[in-house]
Amino acid sequence: ASDVYKRQDVIIGQGTSCKELIEEYGFFDHIIVPIGGGGLIAGTALAVKYFGDNCSVIGTEPLEVDDAYRSLISGKIESNSTTNTIADGLKTQLGDKNFPIILKEVKSIIRITEDEIIESMKLIWQHLKIICEPSCSLPLAGVIKNREQFLGKKIGIIITGGNVDLKNLPF
């Protein structure tokens, strides 16, 4: 079940989170999501294509585990040489079914440092009162890191997952 993100039905199902976001809040300039195996961002990209009205999809992933970033540049699936990140939900390899969607529909990918991951997770916990896992804090970190790019824009971020192992937190 660890490669479930590669299944087309799962990719489409994950896109419903974006569809619901658009239905609830209207159109966005950008929707930002974390990238691990690529199912969520591929599903989001498909939803934006059909429901998003000129919205761009931007991915976020850990700097140390940046296979999607490198794959988007090279045009082929790249591997990681390390899985050294607190964002353990994003250590998975991109799937072959979702990569063509990512390549065609994703505008860019922002790489996030470990410190940025931790700081954005703390902000979500403290200010939104949402217990999210480190992997899910990357979209907020991407907005903070590139605040000038997003200034005056309507941004949607998808925060998923609350699987937190308190023993592994660095604070």
Which ranges hold each PLM region?
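Short, small-residue-biased leader/transition segments that mark boundaries at the very start
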Residues: 1-5
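Glycine-rich phosphate/pyrophosphate-binding loop at beta-loop-alpha junctions
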Residues: 6-104, 150-151, 155-171
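Active-site-adjacent helical/loop segments in soluble small-molecule enzymes
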Residues: 95-152
